[in-house]
UniProtKB/Swiss-Prot annotation:
PROSITE patterns: TRANSALDOLASE_1, TRANSALDOLASE_2. It comes from the Bacteria. The lineage of its organism: Bacteria, Thermotogati, Thermotogota, Thermotogae, Thermotogales. Its main location: cytoplasm. Transaldolase is important for the balance of metabolites in the pentose-phosphate pathway. Keywords: Cytoplasm, Pentose shunt, Schiff base, Transferase. It comes from Thermosipho africanus (strain TCF52B). Pfam families: TAL_FSA. This is Probable transaldolase. Its EC number is 2.2.1.2.
Length: 216
């Protein structure tokens, strides 16, 4: 399974890339706004750090605006993926962009039916929001499982990005059902490294080594 970072923070992205476990990045207007830099400047800087898919979201909600923004964003770097909201205009835009060879990521997916429509339009990726679905007292990972089954049934090549990840268990469950990608906040990536027994083991090794060196 591929792991993307869901952030626009350059320091977090650099650290994840240095660890060797980050395959791509997803951003959205909220994440970009937190960094206090111009939109395109931030996207370009991310492209310089990550050699993999980088999702940049359109702001327009009308069809023509989405197409114009998408074409301009796609010129920034060959790794740019255009993030499009799951709306009728969005799906219409995905159909046009896919024919032009522009990669797309349909976001704000909350049902298998939405994912089916996105795949039929030619989306490169879909992003089901598992955390937000969980908030509604539903099983977010069940929706991912159903989406993947539909894609397998009909041979869709659209990849599933598990989004709105809240904790490492979401990543584990996504991996167990065979999701293509999980996009995670940096805080979740950090937690994936940790286990109390690992810390205890390291502490014991260090104590034993110190005793060995001092002959005690």
């Amino acid at each position: 399974m591929k792991i993307f970072l869901d952030t626009a923070n350059l320091d977090e992205i650099r650290r994840g890339v240095e660890w060797g476990v980050v395959d791509g990045v997803t951003t959205n207007p909220t994440l970009i706004s937190k960094e206090g830099k111009p939109f395109e400047e931030t996207i370009k800087e991310i492209c310089n750090i990550v050699q993999g898919p980088i999702s940049a979201e359109v702001i327009s909600l009308n069809f023509e605006g989405m197409i114009d923004e998408a074409r301009n964003l796609a010129k920034i770097d060959e790794n740019i993926v255009i993030k499009i909201p799951m709306t009728p205009n969005g799906i219409k835009a995905v159909k046009v962009l896919s024919k032009e060879g522009i990669k797309t990521n349909v976001t704000l997916i909350f049902s298998p039916n939405q994912a089916l429509l996105a795949a039929k339009a030619g989306a490169t990726y879909v992003s089901p929001f598992v955390g937000r679905v969980d908030d509604l007292a539903n099983d977010g990972l069940k929706i991912v499982e159903e989406i993947m089954q539909i894609y397998e049934n009909y041979g869709f090549e659209t990849e599933v990005i598990v989004a709105s990840v809240r904790h490492p268990m979401h990543v584990l469950e996504a991996a167990l059902i065979g999701a293509d990608i999980a996009t995670v906040p940096f805080s979740v990536l950090e937690k994936m490294f940790k286990h109390p027994m690992t810390d205890i083991g390291i502490e014991r090794f260090l104590k034993d080594w110190e005793k060995y060196k001092t002959g005690r």
